[in-house]
Amino acid sequence: MSEINISAAAVKELREKTGAGMMDCKKALIETSGNFEEAIDFLRKKGLAAAVKKFGRIASEGLTAIKINGLTSVVIEVNSETDFVARNEQFQNLVKDIVNLAIIAQNIDALKISKMQSGKSVEEEIIENIATIGENLTLRRMDILEISNGAIGSYVHNEVVPHLGKISVLVGLESNAKDKAKLAALAKQIAVHVAGNNPQSIDTLSLDQALVERERKVFFEKSKEEGKPDHIIEKMVEGRIRKFFSEVVLLQQNFLFEPKLTVAEVIKNAEQELGAEIKITKFIRYALGEGIEHEEKNFADEVASITKC
């Protein structure tokens, strides 16, 4: 029997409806001669659409993970619905397998179609795990940090197993310093600092200028309400902006391990000690679930939802 022509739009629609993989959806449509409802039943019988009803649920728990390979590093976030699943060995192994592929894939779209050891794509493997684990799982984001020479520092906070935890940080230091061990130790300390102090940018120039102007406006209005003269207001606003920079700009923050010094001063001291320029080229800080709406449930609702499963 010759294969019937199945449109890409039909495959896409079935995939969105069921959450099954693209190839599985295409096969289901071929097997059912393009009948959409029968294709859904076909996938359900195969266990490939068992995750359908879970797709709409909020996944704000899970794990962040890092992987470093020489001068290249990657961080990912994979979400689950509960912390209980995040401590499940099956879920942890899934995250490990994904982060190992992420460093090769270079971007999230390429990662989703990357093949795992099972032969399935990352996207298909996640869907299969939704069916077996029983919660909505999502590969939310990834980012790459690369340097040409120097050291990459990393830190994982609330680590559940090596390199997997609630907060993951990568810091890239570009430098020709010969003492790589000391450079790596500095990069590690800065990574821990970033985890604890959550800077918004490396320096003032790279800080979101819209954010700066918003803060400036708030400070101005607040000072104006205090009835200060204009020339005093201007000085007060500039003083408050400087304080704001010291709170959100990495180089201007007081260093976690030497609070009397700023990060910029610590780097300058390290440059003198190592005899080479050191530059923070990039940092990445992934905090689990940041920016995701968290579903609030009372105890009665939670028990009711469990009994319905």
From Swiss-Prot:
Which locations, inside or outside the cell, does it occupy?
Cytoplasm
Q: What is its main location?
A: cytoplasm
Q: Which GO terms describe its cellular component?
A: cytoplasm
Keyword Cytoplasm, does the record have it?
yes
What span is annotated as the signal peptide, if there is one? none
Cytoplasm recorded as keyword: yes
Gene Ontology molecular-function annotations: translation elongation factor activity
Question: Which Pfam families does the entry mention?
Answer: EF_TS
Which keywords are on file for this protein? Cytoplasm, Elongation factor, Protein biosynthesis
Database matches in InterPro entries? EF-Ts_dimer_sf, Transl_elong_EFTs/EF1B, Transl_elong_EFTs/EF1B_dimer, Transl_elong_Ts_CS, UBA-like_sf
The UniProt annotation puts the region (Involved in Mg(2+) ion dislocation from EF-Tu) at 82-85
Which family does the UniProt entry place this protein in? Answer: Belongs to the EF-Ts family.
What is the role of this chain?
Associates with the EF-Tu.GDP complex and induces the exchange of GDP to GTP. It remains bound to the aminoacyl-tRNA.EF-Tu.GTP complex up to the GTP hydrolysis stage on the ribosome.
The record ties this protein, via HAMAP family, to: EF_Ts
The protein in question is named Elongation factor Ts
Q: From the UniProt record, report the name of the gene that encodes this protein.
A: tsf
